[in-house]
Swiss-Prot record:
Potent mitogen for mature parenchymal hepatocyte cells, seems to be a hepatotrophic factor, and acts as a growth factor for a broad spectrum of tissues and cell types. Activating ligand for the receptor tyrosine kinase MET by binding to it and promoting its dimerization. Activates MAPK signaling following TMPRSS13 cleavage and activation. The gene is HGF. It comes from Canis lupus familiaris (Dog). The modification Pyrrolidone carboxylic acid is found at Q32. InterPro entries: Hepatocyte_GF, HGF/MST1, Kringle, Kringle-like, Kringle_CS, Kringle_sf, Pan_app, Peptidase_S1_PA. This is Hepatocyte growth factor. Residues 37-123 form the PAN domain.
Length: 730
């Protein structure tokens, strides 16, 4: 008060006004809490509701638009005559049902309901604590030494001041262990033993409920906080951070609620956070004592070939496909990285051997070439498929097995629900007697095997992981001397020794990863790009890092600013097994003009006559140290598969999914940096993309023609994808 006597009244008024106008500083944790979506505090059980057998248990219901609104009212107990422990959101009727009980309450049971989603407050059902356990509201009522707890509203045998009425919001119910003051040691209780006043309860930390093995890829525990204490963002939410790890898209990754997971091969489990300034952080989860792994978690170890994606490959191949030696995993030269033996202890990162520690498409390594960061060891053969597996003959149109999952793990959708979509892309009435339940089938005579529809709007359909029966193989040689079907209708691969081109190549695409050119591609529709699978080595890469540049001649966009179009990639669609193709769906359609155009696809199954002159395009390595960044073209002529095999000294046997082309006399052709680019041929004055550049066996080697993916063999698949996948409107 002495200050008011010393300061003139005017000065005091100005001081008070200044203090009132000062911005309020909100601590980070508190600020985060205010922005927090309360739905993160609930455990979701999809297509589930609760049925109460006890008529005395109350229920409150009201129409609301979203589950988030239901959660907000449940957490705040706003307008509810009880403490809300769970709620059900009726998606069909847009209605909330709030409960003072949950699935663990006596006289309550779960029941399937397609239109319902059950959300239970985690604090009331979790069997572990976070930090000091101040939020724990579970039902443990035994102390660490096994003594039964005294009820909180009782004074026998111990008198105390911890009455439920004095600690509202702390849930001092029954005789359950609690930590109302957030003290060290965790939840506790007064005991029923007159000799022991109180004792802590033996409730584990959530980080210790389930330990992790290896890098935690199989961790399915309940940890929902990062190692710095930040709350995890729900996997089925896109705020505050947008991401691609949607539960319906990755059903086998354990994306339950907002629990820590490791879907992309990081050193350990992590999660997106609710802090807008911190996209993601690692979680503190203890390692299992003996790092034992379930049999289902361990990839099959091989040394001479790769099984699946090669995650279990333990051989000694130590060069990438073109012979460049691998960098040691424990070295940071010439490439710095965090995929070290210390971070990936169970991935056998010995020496410089090819490995697949992060779930990429196949074994790979960092290379000793400073200009090539990563290379794939695609020269390692695939292991033979066991004849005992479920298999199909021909193209699988008569397959009648019971498999009902796609190659990406999605459950197939019932055929009867998708007949309208099926009729949209076939011109005959399918045999409904074969379309049993949701089993994999091939009603449209797809050349690449059985498939099914899914319930995922992002992936309307996909192939099933069924292989052709042993002994029933595709013909390996295509004789191009026979009458042919006309094709026309009424690390980086680079073109070596090509010449600069400014011809009309508006369909040519430069794919950028973090603003660096990595691959070529072809614009085949306004919203679709055809490129090579090797350009996207992992399904788990964030598509936000990729851009498609169109309308450019210079790979850096110099001088092309007015005509350049830069588009984001919204989705990858992987081609049939073994195709090496990828279709990219653009976030918005390209605008066709004088500088951007589409290129035609060939007729399905067509072949181009031998000695037809075609062209490959790319921005890759040119054989010169001073690469000018300009688009290059190299002219090649089509070569029959049998003759092509001879040029490769019989070491390569081509099949009908491949096409061969080589240069006449001069050393010219695609090389590192042009993956995904097109082999373009002209027939009846119509230019078409006949091939796609994929990793070969060296760059423009004399008398060694290039082998490309034959687009005509996959033309029906491309048309089917374009027809069935919805286009995002900008």
């Amino acid at each position: 008060m002495w200050v008011t006597k010393l300061l003139p009244l005017l000065v005091l008024q100005q001081l008070l006004l200044h203090l009132l106008l000062l911005p309020v500083a909100v601590p980070r944790a508190e600020g985060q809490k205010k922005r927090r979506n309360t739905l993160h505090e609930f455990k979701k059980s999809a297509k589930t509701t609760l049925i109460k057998e006890d008529p005395l248990l109350k229920i409150k219901t009201k129409k609301m638009n979203t589950a988030d609104q239901c959660a907000n009212r449940c957490i705040r107990n706003k307008g509810l005559p009880f403490t809300c422990k769970a709620f059900v959101f009726d998606k069909a009727r847009k209605r909330c049902l709030w409960f003072p009980f949950n699935s663990m309450t006596s006289g309550v049971k779960k029941e399937f309901g397609h239109e319902f989603d059950l959300y239970e407050n985690k604090d009331y059902i979790r069997n572990c604590i976070i930090g000091k356990g101040g939020s724990y509201k579970g039902t443990v009522s035994i102390t660490k030494s096994g003594i039964k707890c005294q009820p909180w509203n009782s004074m026998i045998p111990h008198e105390h001041s911890f009455l439920p009425s004095s600690y509202r919001g702390k849930d001092l119910q029954e005789n359950y262990c609690r930590n109302p003051r957030g003290e060290e040691g965790g939840p506790w209780c007064f005991t029923s033993n007159p000799e022991v006043r109180y004792e802590v309860c033996d409730i584990p930390q959530c980080s210790e409920v389930e330990c992790m093995t290896c890098n935690g890829e199989s961790y399915r525990g309940p940890m929902d906080h990062t190692e710095s204490g930040k709350i995890c963002q729900r996997w089925d939410h896109q705020t505050p951070h947008r991401h691609k790890f949607l539960p319906e898209r990755y059903p086998d990754k354990g994306f339950d609620d907002n629990y820590c997971r490791n879907p992309d091969g990081k050193p350990r489990p992590w999660c997106y956070t609710l802090d807008p300034d911190t996209p993601w952080e690692y979680c503190a989860i203890k390692m299992c004592a003996h790092s034992t792994m379930n049999d289902t978690d361990v990839p099959m170890e091989t040394t001479e070939c790769i099984q699946g994606q090669g995650e279990g490959y333990r051989g000694t191949i130590n060069t990438i496909w073109n012979g460049v030696p691998c960098q040691r995993w424990d070295s940071q030269y010439p490439h710095q990285h965090d995929i070290t033996p210390e971070n990936f202890k169970c991935k056998d990162l010995r020496e410089n051997y090819c490995r697949n520690p992060d779930g990429a498409e196949s074994p790979w390594c960092f290379t000793t070439d400073p200009n090539i960061r990563v290379g794939y060891c695609s020269q390692i053969p695939k292991c033979d498929v066991s004849s005992g597996q479920d298999c199909y003959r021909g193209n699988g149109k008569n397959y009648m097995g019971n498999l009902s999952k796609t190659r990406s793990g999605l459950t197939c959708s019932m055929w009867e629900k998708n007949m309208e979509d099926l009729h949209r892309h076939i011109f005959w009435e399918p045999d409904a007697s074969k379309l049993n339940k949701n089993y994999c089938r091939n009603p449209d005579d797809d050349a690449h095997g059985p498939w099914c529809y899914t319930g995922n709007p992002l992936i309307p359909w996909d192939y099933c992981p069924i292989f052709r029966c042993e002994g029933d193989t595709t013909p390996t040689i295509v004789n191009l001397d026979h009458p042919v079907i006309s094709c026309a209708k009424t690390k980086q691969l680079r073109v070596v020794n090509g010449i600069p081109t400014r011809t009309n190549v508006g369909w040519m695409v430069s794919l950028k990863y973090r603003n660096k050119h990595i691959c070529g591609g072809s614009l085949i529709k306004e919203s679709w790009i055809l490129t090579a699978r090797q350009c996207f080595p992992s399904r788990n890469r964030d598509l936000k890092d990729y851009e498609a540049w169109l309308g450019i001649h210079d790979v850096h966009g110099k001088g092309d600013e007015k005509r350049k179009q830069v588009l984001n990639v919204s989705q990858l669609v992987y081609g049939p097994e073994g195709s090496d193709l990828v279709l990219l769906k653009l976030a918005r359609p390209a605008i066709l003009d004088d500088f951007v155009s589409t290129i035609d696809l060939p007729n399905y199954g067509c072949t181009i006559p031998e000695k037809t002159t075609c062209s490959v395009y790319g921005w890759g390595y040119t054989g010169s140290i001073n690469f000018d960044g300009l688009l290059r073209v190299a002219h090649l002529y089509i070569m029959g598969n049998e003759k092509c095999s001879q040029y490769h000294q019989g070491k390569v046997t081509l099949n009908e999914s491949e096409i061969c082309a080589g240069a006449e006399n001069i050393v010219s052709g695609p090389c590192e940096g042009d993956y995904g680019g097109p082999l373009v041929c002209e027939q009846h004055k119509m230019r078409m993309v006949l091939g796609v550049i994929v990793p070969g066996r060296g760059c423009a080697i004399p008398n060694r023609p290039g082998i490309f993916v034959r687009v005509a063999y996959y033309a029906k698949w491309i048309h089917k994808i374009i027809l069935t996948y919805k286009i995002q409107q900008s």
